[in-house]
Amino acid sequence: MKSLPEKLIDSIEVRGEFFNEGKIEEELEEIANLCKENGWKLFYSVPQELFNQEGFNQDIENKILIAEKYNISNLKYSLGHIDIRNTNFNKLNDILNNTSVNVTIENQPNANGTLVEMKKAINYLSDNHIKLGYTFDSGNWYWINENPHVAFDELKDNISVYHLKDIKNKNTMMLNDGNTDWKYMLNELDQNIPIFLEYGIDKDKVVDEMEKVEEVLMKR
């Protein structure tokens, strides 16, 4: 991360599964200090589902405490499956309303992440005033044979964080080499929505990929 071009970055997102399990807080502290030095916001991708058959993920309180300690702005979870009967939404909302940390759910590449299920979940959470944002992953739709452009058009008003990928034949490509009309999506997004490049990039191509995005954003 120390080699990243400071001028093109507002925020970074780290993935929980990439941390050394015995040194998570030690590594987070180092990353948080780097973010502070560069004026970057820090986002954290939790490798867990927020909802399951027993209700909501009880570990969220622990993750929020860690986020507050290391100045993490946003925690992202996979949606999972909402079981309305077993979920204490009042308790969940109390947790979410008593922190400055934003929490988002993401469309995952399985049966819980289809457009039908995402719309159902987002509408239910919105109707019941549950303080959860939505991370739109532009690539995950391909793995479940759904159209990311249709999904984007139907969900764009709910998006609070955007994960950018370009996909071809279910392989992640460099931008402009896949089938995703990512420029259209960026132009349709609210200008305050953070955009993350969420795919493997060779070190010598990182700046090129970021500059492709910057070129589009500067013309909005």
Model-derived features: positions:
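Active-site-adjacent beta->alpha loops and helix N-cap segments on the catalytic face
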Residues: 21-29, 82-92
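Active-site beta-loop-alpha junctions enriched in small/polar residues
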Residues: 15-19, 45-51, 79-82, 106-110, ...
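Conserved anion-binding
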Residues: 100-120
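Hydrophobic alpha-helical segments and helix pairs
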Residues: 60-89
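Conserved glycine-rich "GG(E/T)P / GGGxP" loop and the immediately following alpha-helix
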Residues: 53-56, 113
